């Protein structure tokens, strides 16, 4: 029987009926500071959590103030982090837009006038937000004696500090959600194409989520699970770091030192999330099959196939290094393998194919689909999944 490697994205948790969309988190933050219910208050007390530090987070404040102008992007925190970090870098490189030449300090009217000239530029909202925040902090924190570069570096450090707080707040939300779903409501797995996977509890799991939903609902084992982006753990010892990776893609070959702390690969190194998932692909198991030789059955040792099922992941190029490594190791393993990408609808399928073309290259993708090493199945199509699973 073939082995299974599950690669799970947030769409998996959503398919299981969990409120893990970024929009759910953003609504939770509003609820937390305006009208928290008694159950939430008791949860925070039990976990000894003080929420004052998380109020008016710069990233969530930006989203709430600019939601109408941002289109669909407002609902993706990672896009917002990317845009704001780029805006900080832009302001660092263009300090004349922020400082009055006459007084060498920021004047709000002049900043607004300068920024208004950029209204048609990409990422205008983020640039204006960072510029006006700089104006406020400059006088609140008495930066008059600082050189321009030093003052702008302090703004960058504030955004990095706020990113850490945002990650902590996300951990609080997901931990509370775990409590509601698994201790209070005791939810069960919803029907999906994964129902076709036999012995799913014994699967290896490459988990891009911070939650262990597959463990709760399918009984997958933690020792066979790699939380590649870290995991929630409010009960960790005080000397242990938050391992959750939450950031942006490294878009350039040349390392931009200012953007490094925002990038996922950097956070994976700092938080030591490791490369345990590679073992799932490297490990080769054998089974014995009878082969007919001169009219008689001869036991022969053959490699066990691997079904690599990607469920609820957009295959965003943010995670391209991980997917490239998965494909590379599967090929090196010399066992029969098949990547089975599930999709919610045709629009999502097209997006996954586009992302795979970016990650693998067009020719390689055509080759793999031609060999049936890559196939696509609708996420609710159990029969379709049964048809494509390697035996």
Model-derived features with residue positions:
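SIR2/sirtuin-family catalytic core signature
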Residues: 1-25, 41-47, 296-391
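Active-site-surrounding "flap" and adjacent substrate/cofactor-binding loops of secreted or lumenal enzymes
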Residues: 27-41
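Active-site catalytic pocket residues across diverse enzymes, especially alpha/beta-hydrolases
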Residues: 29, 218-221, 330
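Extended, H/D-rich, highly charged conserved domains that either
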Residues: 39-283
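Extended amphipathic alpha-helical scaffold segments
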Residues: 68, 288-293, 309, 358
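A conditional alpha-helix N-cap/helix-loop micro-motif detector
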Residues: 186-187, 207, 287-291, 316-319
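Extended, charge-rich low-complexity interaction segments
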Residues: 255-291, 365-391
């Amino acid at each position: 029987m073939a082995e299974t490697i599950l690669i799970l994205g947030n769409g998996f948790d959503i398919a299981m009926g969990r409120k893990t969309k970024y929009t759910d988190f953003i609504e939770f933050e509003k609820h937390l500071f305006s009208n928290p219910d008694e159950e939430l208050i008791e949860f925070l007390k039990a976990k000894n959590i003080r929420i004052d530090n998380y109020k008016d987070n710069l990233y969530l404040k930006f989203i709430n103030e600019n939601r109408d102008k941002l289109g669909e992007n407002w609902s993706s925190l990672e896009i917002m982090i990317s845009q704001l970090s780029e805006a900080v870098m832009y302001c660092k490189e263009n300090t004349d837009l922020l400082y009055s030449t006459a007084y060498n300090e920021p004047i709000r009217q002049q900043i607004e006038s300068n920024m208004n000239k950029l209204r048609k530029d990409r990422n205008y909202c983020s640039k204006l937000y960072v510029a006006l925040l700089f104006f406020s902090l400059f006088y609140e924190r008495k930066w008059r004696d600082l050189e321009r570069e030093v003052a702008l570096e302090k703004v960058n450090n504030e955004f990095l500090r706020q990113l850490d707080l945002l990650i902590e707040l996300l951990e609080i939300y997901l931990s509370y959600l775990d409590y509601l779903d698994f201790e209070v409501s005791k939810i069960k797995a919803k029907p999906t194409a994964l129902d076709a996977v036999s012995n799913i509890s014994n699967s290896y799991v490459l988990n891009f989520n911070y939650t262990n939903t597959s463990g709760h609902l399918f009984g997958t084992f933690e020792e066979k699970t790699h939380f590649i982006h870290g995991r929630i753990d409010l009960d960790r010892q005080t000397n242990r770091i938050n391992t959750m990776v939450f950031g942006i893609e490294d878009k350039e070959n040349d390392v931009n030192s200012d953007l490094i702390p925002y990038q996922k690969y950097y956070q994976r190194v700092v938080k030591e999330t490791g490369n345990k998932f590679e073992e799932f692909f490297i490990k080769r198991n054998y089974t014995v099959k009878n082969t007919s030789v001169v009219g008689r059955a001869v036991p022969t040792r053959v490699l066990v196939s691997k079904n690599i099922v990607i469920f609820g992941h957009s295959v965003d190029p943010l995670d391209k290094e991980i997917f490239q490594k998965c494909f590379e190791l599967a090929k090196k393993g010399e066992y029969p393998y098949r990547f089975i990408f599930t999709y919610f609808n045709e629009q999502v399928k097209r997006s996954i194919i586009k992302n795979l073309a970016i990650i693998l290259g067009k020719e390689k993708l055509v080759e793999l689909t031609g060999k049936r090493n890559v196939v696509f199945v609708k996420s609710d199509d159990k029969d379709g999944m049964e048809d494509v699973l390697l035996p």
